[in-house]
Amino acid sequence: MLYPSIDELTEKAESKYILVTVASKRARQLRENSEVQVVRPKSKKFVGLALEEFISDELVHEFLDGRK
């Protein structure tokens, strides 16, 4: 079984498009030597790490108009 599950991710995100955008930008940061925010990550890939951060509330996004 995959972690985090797609059901958990879609419940937490406003839309799947926002989820993909946030995860891809964070994965790019991780690839460029940013520090992982999850204590014991299950994934070794950057996108998986970004999704783990998102589901554990370590990765928070904010819209330019101030929405969260």
From Swiss-Prot:
Q: Print the keywords alphabetically.
A: DNA-directed RNA polymerase, Nucleotidyltransferase, Transcription, Transferase
Q: Which Gene3D superfamilies match?
A: 3.90.940.10
Q: Which GO terms describe its biological process?
A: DNA-templated transcription
Under InterPro entries, the record lists:
DNA-dir_RNA_pol_omega, Pol_omega/Rpo6/RPB6, RPB6/omega-like_sf
Superkingdom as given in the UniProt entry = Bacteria
The secretion signal range is none
| Catalyzed reactions | RNA(n) + a ribonucleoside 5'-triphosphate = RNA(n+1) + diphosphate
Question: Which PANTHER family does this UniProt record tie to the protein?
Answer: DNA-DIRECTED RNA POLYMERASE SUBUNIT OMEGA (PTHR34476:SF1)
Q: Which NCBIfam families match?
A: rpoZ (TIGR00690)
Stated name of the protein: DNA-directed RNA polymerase subunit omega
User: Which lineage do the record's taxonomy fields give for this organism?
Assistant: Bacteria, Bacillati, Bacillota, Bacilli, Bacillales
As recorded in Swiss-Prot or TrEMBL, the protein's gene is named rpoZ
